[in-house]
Each structure stands twice: as C-alpha cells, then as structure tokens.
Design a protein with these regions (language model features):
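Charged catalytic and DNA/RNA-contacting regions of genome-maintenance
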Residues: 11-346, 354, 358-374, 378-469, ...
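Conserved NTPase motor "head" modules and their coupling/switch loops across ABC/AAA+ ATPases, GTPases
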Residues: 16-27, 501, 509, 547, ...
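Cytosolic, long alpha-helical scaffolding segments
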Residues: 420, 427-428, 490-506, 582
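N-terminal amphipathic/basic-hydrophobic helices that include classical n-h-c signal peptides
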Residues: 1-12
C-alpha cells in the first residue's frame, strides 16, 4: 500500500531454470528484456512501464520513484538471478503522480501497451508515446491556470546570444537576441522558464535558475535547426519571421523544436510561427529591479501583495496570463500605449466593460484547449468548454454593436464560427464523462450506426426483465433474479434456500453470503452479443471523436486568433474595472524628458496598510533627477 493509499501490484515471476551450460551473462525474462531495450533509450528519465491497470517502475527508477512519490518499494520475483526492485501507480491516478513529479523538476517517459494481449502470442508490444517534462506539459491538471509554463533555449555566449521560448500549452513561440549575460538573467527573471536548454560545454552560468538542461553541441548547428524550422512551418525561408540572417536565433528556436519533437512524438500543428521580440520595443528591467518592484512575486515569494495581484481582476485564465505578459514586459511605444489607453477609456464610459466581463466568465481556457486539440489529447469536456465559448461570441458581438465606434474598436473582431458551434452541439452530449474511453460522449442522432449498436445494450434491461419472468416460471423459484455487474457480467441469482430447485444446465458463476449466482447457455449467448456490440460501439465512438478533432484541427489557426482577441478584450476590461475601482488615471505621454505626478499613490502600499494612504507629488525633469 503506497503512502497515498493506493495499492501497488505484486507479481510473481520464477527465475530462469539453472543449467551447467549457462553463460556468465544473467538471463532475463522476456518482459525484462523488453523493459531494458526501452529503458536504454531513456537512461536518465523515469520510465513508467504500463502493465495492465498499473504503470510500473523497476530497479533504480523504482527506488527514485518511491522517494519522490511516497509509494511502496517492493520486489517483483527475480530476473537475471536477482530480485527486481519495483513500485507502481494505478493508471487512473496517473495525472496526480505526474503533477508531483513535475513540481519536483522531474521528467517521465510514458511507455504504453500499443497492442492487445493475445493468449499464446507472447508479450504485448510497448513503446514510449510521450516524455513528460516540466517545460512540456499541456494537461489542465498539471498547469497553473494563470501562469505560463515555458520551455526556453539559450544559444551563443559572451556578447552575442539568443533566447527562444515557447509554451506548448498555448503555441506561443518567441525569440529575442541579447548582448550580455545580465540581459539573459533579466529575461530569465521575467519568463521564469520551467526548463532552460543550453549547449553542453558552453560555460554559461546563470545565478537565477536551477532548471538548466544541457543539450549536445550538434543540436545547436544552425543549418540543421534552419531545416527543422522550415519543415515545421512549411516555408522556404525564415524571412517572414525576421530571423533569416540571425543564426543564433535560428539555433535557439531549432533546439526548442527538436526537444519538443523528441518528447512529444507527434505533430505540433498549433505552432504556427515565431515572433521576434525586439529589445527597443520594451522597457528594460534587470533581474534585481524586477524582484524589488514585486511585479509578480513579493520579496517573500508570495503573489498576493504584488502589482499583478492588485491589477489582475480578469475573469478568464488566458486573460490573466496575457495581463501578466503586458505588466511584466512594459511597452515603450507611445502609439501602442495610446491605443490601449483609448480602448480602456471606451470601456470605462458607462461601465461598458461589465456586460463583456459577465459573458466572458464562462468562456474557459480556449487557448490551452486548442493546443490539446492540436496534439490530440483534448478531452470531451474540453470540447464542451469550446462549444460554450463559441456560443458566447454572438452575444459579445451584440454588446459591441450596441456601443459607439470607440467601443466597437476596443472589442475588436470576434468571429462566431456558427458551423463549428453547431457541429459540437450535434456531436457531444451536454455533460460528457471525463474520458472518451468511458464511452457515452457522442450524442444520440450524430451517427446512425453508433445508435444501432447502442440499441441492444440500452434494451438489455427489458430483455432481463422478460428473461427473469421466464426463468421464474420454468424453475418455480419466485425469488429468482436476473442481473448484471461489471466484474462478473450477467447472472441468475438464487438464494441458498432454493438451491434444490436449480436446473442442471445452470453453471455457478459467483458465491454470495446468502445466494449463488449462475449463468446458462442462453444468457451467455446474450451476454456475448451485448458485449460485442458494446465493444464495437465504443470503437466507433472513439472513431467519431477522432474525426471531430480532425475537423477542429482544420480550423486551429483562426480559432487561435479568436482566443488572442478574447484575451485582449478581457485584459482591457480588467484594466477598465481596476481604473474605476481603484481610482486610477491614464498618464499624458509627452515628447519631453520628465515625470510629473500629482496626488500619486503607491498601488501596493495603499492596499496593505490599515490607515489611508497619503498622496504625494513628484516632479522630475532633465534638471531634477533622483
């Protein structure tokens, strides 16, 4: 029994028979041979080896996992003449254990059974389908909803470097060229990547992160990286991204893409391009200044009493993440700042932000849902959340249309995708189960063949009632029951007091405290028919679901643009609400050098002190400096 209350499987395996002609090399069982072959590809990563309803770990991995996850370390028979250290976790609790590993900075290779067990046919085929690392997670349960989970790579050294970063859970892919280690540390402090990939032997030492992983020098070769990027984005060159003549930027971006392909082992269609972040477009804040200003984390590490904590009143997770990006990377462009200020002012007029916020509350995290659709890990409830979000779009459009020109401009274009919304309405039931493997996800009427296959299972209860009545008449047992459970299947139940009346053609299936359960040939035939139909129905339902994901995948790019627009509107509404609630005013931006504040208040201090804050004036110019 593990420390968390889950049972760990124990299996007996006899050691190979000894022989005088045995070689000195230990003989391993076929299962362990398969394990060693796969483990050789991932020597430094925990290998979670699927065996039935459990993921097992062996040898040194088992010892590590037992400590990291607080689960029981045991042994599994012998192989090669030695006991096999083993631990395991139930497959249905896998996400919880992955979350605990990721929080500790660990990675895990997920090895699945990719063929069905067939009696007499030897081992089932197994292969690693994905490597989960701290910087590549996409599951909702493993992510902080309002914080980006970034994977970054650094190329170069000295005065010429490039930093690339992306969030697999959203598809945002950025790169920035840097000129000093101090600039690198400033960006690391801002981005807080979950993993940072650097060139092995580069000598780069960073003081503000311990999430550094070395990659082989050949992986940073710009020629190979350029080829990978062109293939991913299906383009002839990188001119459109602005990095065609930037070999370090190409190397950093290419290393990220290579790492994703190595760990995810699937296409990444939601990575649509690379954006270059120009240093002169944003205010430079060094790492120490960022910490002292308590922008996203206080000096004690808390997030509550920070600038973001005070200004983030967003009602969606994706809006909250964009708000953090805006505050953490202040603009220098007066044109772009003026556009934001104008939009916030338009939303403040008549409290027009409130109707938008009310509708946006139920939109959900569309940005991350789209990424899961792209890598085909989206769950049924992801699709119902997307369906609801698409259903909200016409109402958001109506709110914008009801306002003036400035309000329409602030809201931006919000396409509704009526065809996709209608498809999701037809395809998915209102409240589906969590996983497609549980079945019961596709709505009745969506697929005629699926409806037919489900028909027999749904009518089984009527058959059982009639069959029970018939068997009572045949046997003369008035208390006889015909039923079904998931473990033993269909059964005929007879109490111990009527055992003498049980027909000889009944075969015992289960013994209870006060009754025996049987099955006969007729009920077995019915059971086989129903179970076959259920299996076929589930297979067809999975096929329908996969086809639905493919349809959504074809619209992934415009849907990503929609999620960006929703996030932008959400942040503008949040700023408008904060401006009203906290009595904040827009600054006047001028060409001359200086800073003039009248009745200024410190946004953090006034929120944490008990007595009213005393406003202060400040006037700085070229003759008056701090």
């Amino acid at each position: 029994l593990g420390g968390d209350g889950h049972y760990v499987t124990l299996h007996r395996m006899s050691p190979p028979a000894s022989s005088k002609k045995e070689s000195k090399q230990p003989k391993h069982t076929p299962l362990m041979q398969q394990y060693f072959r796969i483990k050789a590809e991932f020597p430094d990563t925990l290998l979670l080896f699927r065996m039935g309803d459990f993921y097992e770990v062996f040898y040194d991995d088992a010892k590590r996992a037992a400590k990291l996850l607080d689960i029981t370390l045991t042994t599994r028979g012998e192989s090669g003449g030695e006991p096999i250290p083993m631990a395991g976790v139930p497959h249905h609790a896998m996400e919880n254990y992955l979350a605990r590993l990721v929080r500790q900075g660990e990675s895990a290779a997920i090895c699945e059974q990719v063929s069905e067990p067939v009696p007499g046919k030897g081992l089932v085929e197994r292969k690693v389908v994905r490597v989960v690392t701290p910087g590549t997670i996409t599951e909702e349960a493993l992510l902080e909803s309002r914080q980006e989970n970034l994977l970054a790579a650094l190329a170069g050294s000295g005065k010429r470097m490039a930093l690339a970063w992306l969030e697999l859970a959203s598809g945002r892919f950025m790169v920035r060229e840097l000129e000093s280690l101090e600039e690198v540390e400033a960006q690391i402090e801002r981005l807080q990547p979950a993993e940072l990939l650097v060139e092995e032997g580069s000598g780069v030492v960073l003081s503000n992160t311990d999430r550094v992983h070395s990659r082989a020098p050949w992986k940073f070769e710009s020629k190979q990286c350029r080829k990978m990027l062109r293939e991913q984005f299906r383009i002839k060159d990188l001119v459109g991204f602005g990095i065609e003549d930037s070999p370090l930027a190409i190397s950093a971006a290419g290393v990220l893409l290579d790492y994703l392909q190595e760990t995810q082992r699937t296409a990444l269609p939601h990575l649509q391009g690379i954006q270059v972040e120009q240093a002169d477009e944003f205010m430079h804040l060094d790492a120490i200044s960022r910490r002292n200003l308590e922008i996203e984390a206080s000096m004690s590490g808390e997030q509550k009493h920070t600038l973001v904590g005070i200004l983030d009143s967003s009602v969606t997770a994706m809006g909250g993440r964009l708000l953090r990006r805006w505050i953490g990377n202040p603009l220098r462009s007066r044109v772009r700042l003026a556009a934001r200020h104008k939009a916030i002012g338009a939303l403040q007029a008549g409290l027009d932000y409130e109707p938008f916020r009310e509708e946006l509350r139920g939109v959900g995290d569309v940005e991350r849902i789209l990424s899961r659709i792209a890598i085909k890990t989206a769950r049924p409830r992801d699709l119902t959340t997307l369906r609801h979000a698409l259903g909200v779009m016409p109402r958001l459009q109506a709110i914008a249309e009801g306002g003036d020109k400035d309000l329409k401009q602030a809201a931006g274009e919000l396409p509704a995708f009526p065809d996709l919304h209608e498809l999701l309405e037809r395809a998915i039931i209102d409240e589906p189960p969590m996983l497609i493997r549980d079945g019961g996800v596709i709505r009745k009427g969506y697929d005629e063949e699926l409806d037919e296959l489900r028909g027999l299972s749904e009518n089984a209860s009527e058959f059982l009632l009639n069959y029970e009545k018939e068997q009572k008449e045949i046997t003369g047992i008035s208390s006889l029951k015909v039923g079904y459970n998931r473990v033993h299947g269909y059964f005929i139940e007879v109490t111990h007091t009527h055992q003498q009346l049980v027909p000889t053609e009944y075969t015992r299936r289960q013994t209870l405290k006060s009754a025996e359960r049987y099955i006969n040939e007729e009920l077995k035939v019915f059971e086989d028919k129903v179970m076959t139909r259920r299996e076929r129905a589930l297979a067809l339902e999975k096929h329908c679901y996969a086809a639905l994901l493919e349809t959504l995948l074809g619209e992934i790019e415009p849907l990503q643009h929609l999620s960006e627009r929703i996030s932008r509107l959400e942040v503008l509404c949040a700023f408008a609400e904060r401006a009203d609630r906290l009595n904040l005013v827009q600054p006047d931006m001028v060409d001359s050098e200086g800073l003039h504040i009248e009745g200024g208040r410190h946004p953090l201090v006034e929120q944490v002190q008990d007595e009213p804050f005393t406003p202060n004036d400040m006037h700085l110019d070229e003759d008056t400096r701090m």
